[in-house]
Amino acid sequence: MEIVDHIGSIELLKLEKTAFLCSRKIPAGIVLKCYDWAISQREMGKCIISGFHSKIEKDVLHYLLKGQQPIIIALARGLKQHLEPELEAELKKGRLLIITPFEKHVKRITAETADIRNRLMIDLAENITAGFISKEGNLEKLLSQSNKDIIKIG
């Protein structure tokens, strides 16, 4: 797995990184625990890498962006033409890196591209935190193949 394209400070890859992954369907009671986790990571200045694609991952990104710690967004598609203004501002501060294992012509996110992106994040991260892992879901299968320790929030 390799990074094909990026925007932002590639130097962030040298930092210790925690990958945040979460099944798309998550029990309501675990959502707040994920928010608390994001706030604690922000307060400790930890570098988090995630796809920030699902609803819960976007919420985690929202909490992380309120801090000053480094953030790495891993896309399951090629780089976008235009970024959201809040991401542009963080790129200028040097605290954000957006990476992708895909060329620009890959425009749609599929289960396959998400799996490739998730494998890249797991390869790059020293630590893995899972918000929630659905039984027999894609994330459970993927994480069972990793030899890294996995911290489970819920």
Model features per residue range: what roles?
Residues M1-G154:
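Glycine-biased, small-residue-rich flexible motifs in mid-sequence functional cores and linkers
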